[in-house]
């Protein structure tokens, strides 16, 4: 099977984007893993699939597959690339679209300055809906990680995040703790592990160990979850600029019950065609 694709990135968080509207696409988890392999495939953190909408009130369906082949609910950096892709490919003339994901509706918009703003929806804080096993609704929760107790905030941005505040994000044990937190039994759907350093009231630094992908250069939903965390803990105020290893995102959130707005770049790198067997 020959497959046309486009390679894109949002702050170095890179994607293989596939149009499943104008070509037939039915990938197995093993095929996704091969495409995502940086030595034997194209290479990416996630593979994004553009499909026709299944309901009349949205423009497209957006599916996300991690590099390990598993399908996940949401990807913020990918959402920015998604709207740029469908616009550049002539699949829509709209600059603002409504997109269905496994976790609900998002609304990305191409801005005049070339950046993309995405309404990421209202963050979920109730532990059972994250999902996170806890008998408390406290914002800060203790979590045993390899015999050490760390303080985390559990947030879902359509996908689950465990965010901890650290003094120095460069020295944070992202690889060691991130792998343990990702598969912690209190997160039955696994989780993305965020490590955030507060610089001042409107700036934070962030690293994220992503579920199914490991540490990436940037994580859009992770940035949203981190901003929700520091605002809830009264360590920062909206809007917040988030520094990642791949670049910066601007996040605005006015508090519980309100949607999170994320603004950042989306870049097309190259397009190609690959044989998938």
From Swiss-Prot:
Reaction it catalyzes: (2S,6S)-2,6-diaminopimelate = meso-2,6-diaminopimelate
Biological-process GO terms, alphabetical: lysine biosynthetic process via diaminopimelate
EC number: 5.1.1.7
One GO location term (cellular component): cytosol
SUPFAM superfamilies: Diaminopimelate epimerase-like (SSF54506)
Pfam families, alphabetized: DAP_epimerase (PF01678)
Entry binding sites for substrate: 13, 46, 66, 76-77, 159, 192, 210-211, 220-221
Known pathway: Amino-acid biosynthesis; L-lysine biosynthesis via DAP pathway; DL-2,6-diaminopimelate from LL-2,6-diaminopimelate: step 1/1
NCBIfam families: DapF
Family to which the UniProt record says this protein belongs: Belongs to the diaminopimelate epimerase family.
Protein task: Catalyzes the stereoinversion of LL-2,6-diaminopimelate (L,L-DAP) to meso-diaminopimelate (meso-DAP), a precursor of L-lysine and an essential component of the bacterial peptidoglycan.
Name of the molecule in the record: Diaminopimelate epimerase
Species for this entry: Aromatoleum aromaticum (strain DSM 19018 / LMG 30748 / EbN1) (Azoarcus sp. (strain EbN1))
